[in-house]
C-alpha cells in the first residue's frame, strides 16, 4: 500500500506539467488539410528576403507536416499562412584594425505570421518573431562572395523551423 501511495504521489505532479505527445497540441484544427502560403509581404528595404522566408516556410511545412501546401493564396485552401517581414537591419559587429573596416556583420530580421481559417477565424498569430545571423565580409575583391544572401537563407531556415514548431506544438 505504501509503495502505491508513494508512486501515486510522485506521478501526480506529472499529470499537470503540460507534457503532451507530438502533434497533440497543435493550433491547427483536424479539418484543415490544405494550407496556402502566399509570398510573404515585406516592409523592409531588402532584396529577396520575403522569397527566402516564403520558400523556407513552404519547405519546412512540406517536410514536417502532412498538409497539402499551395504556394499562392487560394479559395480552395482550408487555411492561409500570411507572413510579413517587418524590418531587416545589418549592423557592423567586429572591425578589422588593419583596414579600419568591418569584418563581420549582424543581420536582424523581424517578422510576423498569421494563420487564418477559410472562414477568417485566426488559428495562429505571432506578431514579433526576431532572428539574428552573423556573417563575415571580405576586402578581397577577387574572392568576394556576397555572404549576406547566405546569412538571410540561414535566418529564413531558422525562422521556418521555429514558426512551424510553434504552430504545430504550441511551445
What is the predicted function of each stretch?
Residues 65-67, 75-126, 133-150:
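Surface-exposed short loop/turn segments
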Residues 17-66, 119, 139-141, 161, ...:
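A structural "domain/chain start" motif
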Residues 44-55, 102-106, 146-158:
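Soluble non-cytosolic domains of exported or imported proteins
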Residues 28-29, 72-77:
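Short, glycine-/polar-rich solvent-exposed loops and beta-turns at beta-strand/coil boundaries
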Residues 33, 38, 70, 81-82, ...:
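A short, local hydrophobic-aromatic micro-motif
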Residues 1-17:
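Sec-dependent bacterial lipoprotein signal peptides
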